[in-house]
Amino acid sequence: MSFRAARLSMRNRRNDTLDSTRTLYSSASRSTDLSYSESDLVNFIQANFKKRECVFFTKDSKATENVCKCGYAQSQHMEGTQINQSEKWNYKKHTKEFPTDAFGDIQFETLGKKGKYIRLSCDTDAEILYELLTQHWHLKTPNLVISVTGGAKNFALKPRMRKIFSRLIYIAQSKGAWILTGGTHYGLMKYIGEVVRDNTISRSSEENIVAIGIAAWGMVSNRDTLIRNCDAEGYFLAQYLMDDFTRDPLYILDNNHTHLLLVDNGCHGHPTVEAKLRNQLEKYISERTIQDSNYGGKIPIVCFAQGGGKETLKAINTSIKNKIPCVVVEGSGQIADVIASLVEVEDALTSSAVKEKLVRFLPRTVSRLPEEETESWIKWLKEILECSHLLTVIKMEEAGDEIVSNAISYALYKAFSTSEQDKDNWNGQLKLLLEWNQLDLANDEIFTNDRRWESADLQEVMFTALIKDRPKFVRLFLENGLNLRKFLTHDVLTELFSNHFSTLVYRNLQIAKNSYNDALLTFVWKLVANFRRGFRKEDRNGRDEMDIELHDVSPITRHPLQALFIWAILQNKKELSKVIWEQTRGCTLAALGASKLLKTLAKVKNDINAAGESEELANEYETRAVELFTECYSSDEDLAEQLLVYSCEAWGGSNCLELAVEATDQHFIAQPGVQNFLSKQWYGEISRDTKNWKIILCLFIIPLVGCGFVSFRKKPVDKHKKLLWYYVAFFTSPFVVFSWNVVFYIAFLLLFAYVLLMDFHSVPHPPELVLYSLVFVLFCDEVRQWYVNGVNYFTDLWNVMDTLGLFYFIAGIVFRLHSSNKSSLYSGRVIFCLDYIIFTLRLIHIFTVSRNLGPKIIMLQRMLIDVFFFLFLFAVWMVAFGVARQGILRQNEQRWRWIFRSVIYEPYLAMFGQVPSDVDGTTYDFAHCTFTGNESKPLCVELDEHNLPRFPEWITIPLVCIYMLSTNILLVNLLVAMFGYTVGTVQENNDQVWKFQRYFLVQEYCSRLNIPFPFIVFAYFYMVVKKCFKCCCKEKNMESSVCCFKNEDNETLAWEGVMKENYLVKINTKANDTSEEMRHRFRQLDTKLNDLKGLLKEIANKIK
């Protein structure tokens, strides 16, 4: 089957699944979207399903009362029943079929649970029964059927057996399987029902289990309550009482089964009547052909046997004859242990050997059996063991989480691979093992040296492995010849992103794109939206707009591996994404891109656990990027540095450094290789061995540059222009430009201070005019940065400070120009003074490059955030105290200025130790207040009839004490603790934080024009003129993308691929060494434990 056909087939199956409605009762919910009305369903059942009634009374000679051999008394027979005295009773001759009178919903009165039930003849056609289950009771077509048998009587559930049953139910739930049991509240069936109930309670209703019980109608206790009333119309609800205290030999029905099929052959008290119909139903299901089955177009069915006696033996025998594989639990006792022990016999199987095993495991049962029946048992066992390839044995003592799953999958695989029509169907066998995630079997049985696999043969199963998140199978297919690049066509990627991509992830991606306005996020969102082109979204105005499509699909067609990697990363497919990452080109860039995407998405996820998983995976990819780059750098520094600046359109045109910074991957930026690269950029052509003081000295004594005082990384090519080359290389170095800017900025601040303090006149003097020209140069530089960075310019706090400083300076000039007005001139000077503070604080940013001062500056920045939190808490305390104090002391103060002083200013000063003096009546000074409110004094406190302060001191003084205690001790110490935590956090990663912040300064000066201040202004004029000339001539830049097409890029990526393989080998070797070390430690512990046991025995013997 071609991949396109497989994909269309998967799409059809998905649509069929959406169109069908699953109806479950008891632990399953009933569907409300029925294709038939209740009356149609009743008509269908009455037309196709029958009950059986005995119409010939044959007296049972062994019975004491007048009872027929069918088990019913003569009075319980219908009117007109004939008397039969000579013939042997047979249900086919002596019973007659009538329309069934027992079907509908069954409600268990004890627990109030519901289920579906029907009474049907033992001769009912299996096809009609299957139609009832799937089309009328709306059960989804099973992906697997598990027929559980054994342990109907005297069954005691062991803890390990309960674990096996729990795993069996989990498999049924996860695989969409049907479980077939005896359906009674007795023995094995009772415990199966309880496990079904426990698993149903712990999971959502959409994942409920289908547990079908098939029991004999004549063995059901209280079955009269299941018969419909004569006047009942439509569907019937039967009220069934579970009477556990009844000593009746009959069984009660189990309340945890979802569907009950009650098989009737006209008898009462005759067990095993249902066996024939159950076998027919199992055979019909196993032979039914369905589309898209991973079992050769059939529904897989497996018999699960434990314990049991004769009926279990017959059930296993029938299953084996019908080519149904069987899983037997060794250690569960009785017939299961007999079969398990005989499977291990290597010699030819003799009757005596079989009988020996029967006597060993079933001594009482075999001793009571007639010889003929014993021979029948031996015959059945031999028939079973002739098809030993259909038997799979698991040991109850070794019951683990995967033992049941492995056993069922292995049983199905053996049955499938040994069948005549499917033994050469390698693709079908591989699908089966993929469905059950059996990698070892696939490795050992299918991918052998006997067969050569083509890439096209593995494409269908590869797609299944991707959507089922089977990373080990994906790796296996890649190792066996699958070409991932050829497999990832546009149709495949469209199918993955449109039908196997979480809508929630898509919404989170869209939220992140809108929130952070990030280039990579926008690119990835457009890429995903291009595949999900049928998706529509509604904008804020309520209008519909189509998804944005990528106009250039080349990033997708040229980089399908990166698109698949992004698909896996966005959905947090941890192990699968790692397998795909190993196949991509530009692994370092891909790892950093994954880290950035995951960290950004984690910020917008509402689920804390999901956000934590994304953060954890992001950190893993950062670690991979660090380790891989370290491997590359240790091999070749120059090529490793080329990797840092390599960009790819599949990641929005970003390079490794940009993605690492945007993802805040400080560990990567702090790597020696990255820092050495930044240092090369920082010093330019100047050798890094040159001392900084030499470079700074050359700024003041320029001729030293050409005298060999400063060393350079390389020698000039043209000897005649050697001196010119030295000067150009020196003054274009970012470090020299930075140093010159520092000198210039300090000179600018000194000039600014001189003008403010000594030379500020009504008419500007030359120093002030020089100051204006220097600020103009700063203004031009900020305009250039804004033009280059766009909106991102204002994301940097220092840029905001620069803009604010320039804005204040312009405002100061505006006031300064009105020199005729003294007040305006003074206002201008005040604004200049405030602006000087901003420009001076801006000096802090320059020294972030210092290894010693840089971390301290970062601490200051983070402590400012702590101060804002502190001020919020302090404001609550301050306003509460200030309003209460003012209201207690004074009445109807109308002056806002004094209200502000009393409510805000004075409580604020109290935090610094200035205790309010107006809360103590004994020391209150009326000379410093006013009663009229007209003077520049605070309002006096309210007086009583004796002209004494009215306020109660027993309130005001304790109030001040509590306020001082809360602010000066509690809040201030809280702030100190916050500062301590912040400093400690930065101190722990002192080196990383500084190196990360250093990157921004290096990039800032590397992106600037390499011309010292203030001469750079001429370059700005030249750039403006050039831009205007281009606009007038309407020149267009038609350069096309050359991503990954340059020879140097291909060589670098090929070399990185080799380094990646070395890195992966080291990881695997390290993991193997760790495992070996653990095994060695366990062996040492085992030896020590044995020595201790021996020592304890010696001590015990001495005591005796």
Swiss-Prot record:
Q: Name one GO cellular component term.
A: plasma membrane raft
Coiled-coil blocks? 1071-1104
What is known to happen upon mutating residue 802 to A? Decreases ion channel sensitivity to cold stimulis
Q: Topological domain, Cytoplasmic: which ranges? A: 1-733, 790-796, 849-853, 984-1104
Catalytic function, reaction form: Ca(2+)(in) = Ca(2+)(out); Na(+)(in) = Na(+)(out); K(+)(in) = K(+)(out)
Q: Where in the cell does this protein reside?
A: Cell membrane; Membrane raft; Endoplasmic reticulum membrane
Provide the effect of residue 746 to A.
Does not affect ion channel activity to cold stimulis
Q: Which UniProt keywords apply?
A: Calcium, Cell membrane, Coiled coil, Endoplasmic reticulum, Glycoprotein, Ion channel, Ion transport, Membrane, Metal-binding, Sensory transduction, Transmembrane, Transmembrane helix, Transport
User: What broad class describes the main subcellular location of this protein?
Assistant: membrane
Intramembrane feature spans:
896-912
Which residues does the annotation flag as glycosylated? Answer: 934
List where the protein spans the membrane.
734-758, 766-789, 797-817, 823-848, 854-890, 955-983
Q: Where is this region: Epitope?
A: 187-195
Activity regulation: the record says: Activated by cold temperatures and by both natural and synthetic cooling compounds such as menthol and icilin. Activation of the channel requires the presence of PI(4,5)P2. PI(4,5)P2 regulates the activation and desensitization of TRPM8 channels. Activated by intracellular Ca(2+).
Expression tissues: Expressed in prostate. Also expressed in prostate tumors and in non-prostatic primary tumors such as colon, lung, breast and skin tumors.
Q: Which GO terms describe its biological process?
A: calcium ion transmembrane transport; intracellular calcium ion homeostasis; positive regulation of cold-induced thermogenesis; response to cold; thermoception
- Could you tell me which InterPro entries the record lists for this protein? Ion_trans_dom, TRPM, TRPM_SLOG
Consequence when changing residue 998 to Q: Decreases in sensitivity to PI(4,5)P2. Insensitive to icilin
Give the free-text miscellaneous remark of the entry. Answer: Its expression in most prostate tumors as well as the presence of an immunogenic epitope suggest that it may be suitable for the design of peptide vaccination strategies for prostate cancers.
What assembly does the database describe for this protein? Homotetramer. Isoform 2 and isoform 3 interact with the C-terminus of isoform 1 in a thermosensitive manner with decreased interaction at 21 degrees Celsius compared to 37 degrees Celsius. Interacts (via N-terminus and C-terminus domains) with TCAF1; the interaction stimulates TRPM8 channel activity. Interacts (via N-terminus and C-terminus domains) with TCAF2 isoform 2; the interaction inhibits TRPM8 channel activity.
Q: What does this protein do?
A: Non-selective ion channel permeable to monovalent and divalent cations, including Na(+), K(+), and Ca(2+), with higher permeability for Ca(2+). Activated by multiple factors, such as temperature, voltage, pressure, and changes in osmolality. Activated by cool temperatures (<23-28 degrees Celsius) and by chemical ligands evoking a sensation of coolness, such as menthol and icilin therefore plays a central role in the detection of environmental cold temperatures.
Q: What is this protein called?
A: Transient receptor potential cation channel subfamily M member 8
What organism does the record attribute this protein to? Homo sapiens
